[in-house]
Amino acid sequence: MSQRKYFGTDGIRGHVGLSNINPEFVLKLGWAVGCVLANGARKKVVIGKDTRVSGYMLESALEAGLSAAGVDVALLGPMPTPGIAYLTQTLRANAGIVISASHNLFEDNGIKFFSADGGKLPDSVELAIEAQLEKQLQTVPSVKLGKATRINDAAGRYIEFCKSTIPSLSRLSNLKIVVDCANGATYHIAPNVFSELGADVVPIGIKPDGFNINQECGSTAPELLREKVIAVGADIGIGLDGDGDRVILVDSLGNLVDGDQIIYIIAKDRHQRGVLHGGVVGTLMSNYGLELAITSLGVPFQRSKVGDRYVLETLREKDWKIGGETSGHIVCLDKTTTGDGIVAALQVLSIMVKQNKALHELTAGIQLLPQTLVNLKTNNAALLASNPDVIQAVKNLEKHLNGEGRVLLRPSGTEPLLRVMVEGANASIVKQQAQMLCDDISQIDKKLTESLPST
C-alpha cells in the first residue's frame, strides 16, 4: 500500500493553524474530495461538525472547495459522528464529512470521511484524494458550481433513528439517568433521546461555547459524571465524548463501566437470545478479562489492531456484529455502520429494563485485570517500538509477569506518543513495572534522539 502523506488512522487531525488543519489546506482538501467523488457527475456531500469554534472556519473552507469542484453540499450543523454516518446514507449522499477531533480539546480539530454506505472510505479513495491534493486547484465553470443547503431537521432525524435501535415497546420510565454530553456534538440530541423514551434525565455538559468541549467532562474525564450520579441517586450515568462515538457508563454505586464491560453486557445478552451472529472483536488493548469472559460463554473472541477502523474491518471480514475498544468505541453492526455512543448506551439500558437488573449486576460476570496505560511523549514512537533494546526490555518484563499478564507497545496514529500498556494480576506491581519500563524506554529514546541526524 502506498504511504499516506496526509491521512492518519482516522482522517486528518492536528492543532488548528499549526498543522494542515488550516483554511487554505482544508479548502483544497474539499476540492480534492469533490474531484475524486464527482468524476464528472453531479454529486452531493454532507458535512457535520462538533462544537469547536474552529468548526465554523473549516466548514466554510470545505464548502468552498467542494463547490469549486462542482459538488453540492448539505450542511448538518453540530452533529455526532455516527449521526453524520447515518444521514450520509439516508440523504443518499455520495460521502459524509466530519469536522471533529473527537475526544481532544478545542485547540485541535480534524477531518474524516464516510462513504455513501456510512462506512469508512476505502484506502483507494483516500489515496486518490491525496494524489489530487498534489494538483493545481481548478474551479469548474460557474454553471457547474456546487450549491449548499442546510438540513434543518438533521437532529430530529438522528434522534428518531437512535430510538429505533431498541424494541419499540422498551420504556425507560423507571430509570433516572445522568448524561454527560462533553459540551460536544450530542448536547442537543442525547438528552432528548433518553427523555423521549421516558427516562428521568439529568443532563450535564450541554452548554458548549466553542472552547469547552471535552474540558473536564465527557467520557475521558468521568469524575463529574460519577459525582452527579451519586448526588442525584441516578440508576446510571452515561458519558459521551465530544463527537459522540465513544461512551463510558457509571453504575448507581459510582463504579466506572468501560468499553470492555459494555461489550460484554451487549454480547452476552445477544448470545443468550441467539442473535449474536458469530463472535466478538476487541483490540490488542482490550483487557484480558474481556477475552476470558467472552470465551467462557462459548463465544469466539478476536483481537484487531487498535482503532475503530480496524475493529470494523475485522467485524466485516468475519461477518460478526459486536466489537469495540476499552475507550468506549462500541460497534453494533446489527444497528449501525460505525461506533455510536448513544446507540451503545441504549442497548445497555434496554437490557437493564428487560432483565430488571441494575448495571452493577450486569457487570458481575466480567472481572477485569489491573491494567496500566502510560502515554510516553516521543517523536520516535515507531522507531522505539521496533528497537532491539526496547524489545528486550519488554521481554524481561513479560518474563517477570510469569505468564499472568501482557505488555503492549503501540505508537499513536494521531499524536507523538508511544502507548505503553502493562496488564497483570496485581495492580500495584503492574503500575510499578509499567513506570520502570517507561523509564527504560525514555533512556533509550534519549540516546536514539542524540544519534539521529539533526534537521
UniProtKB/Swiss-Prot annotation:
Enzyme Commission (EC) number: 5.4.2.10
Pfam (any one): PGM_PMM_I
Cofactor note: Binds 1 Mg(2+) ion per subunit.
Residues bound to Mg(2+): 102, 241, 243, 245
EC top class named in words: isomerase
Biological processes per GO annotation: carbohydrate metabolic process; peptidoglycan biosynthetic process; UDP-N-acetylglucosamine biosynthetic process
Key words of the record: Isomerase, Magnesium, Metal-binding, Phosphoprotein
Cofactor(s) recorded in Swiss-Prot or TrEMBL: Mg(2+)
Molecular functions (GO terms): magnesium ion binding; phosphoglucosamine mutase activity; phosphomannomutase activity
Phosphoserine modified-residue sites: 102
PTM per Swiss-Prot/TrEMBL: Activated by phosphorylation.
Active site residues of this protein: 102
HAMAP family per UniProt: GlmM_B
Role this protein plays: Catalyzes the conversion of glucosamine-6-phosphate to glucosamine-1-phosphate.
Family: Belongs to the phosphohexose mutase family.
Xref: PANTHER family: PHOSPHOGLUCOMUTASE (ALPHA-D-GLUCOSE-1,6-BISPHOSPHATE-DEPENDENT) (PTHR42946:SF1), PHOSPHOHEXOSE MUTASE (PTHR42946)
Protein name: Phosphoglucosamine mutase
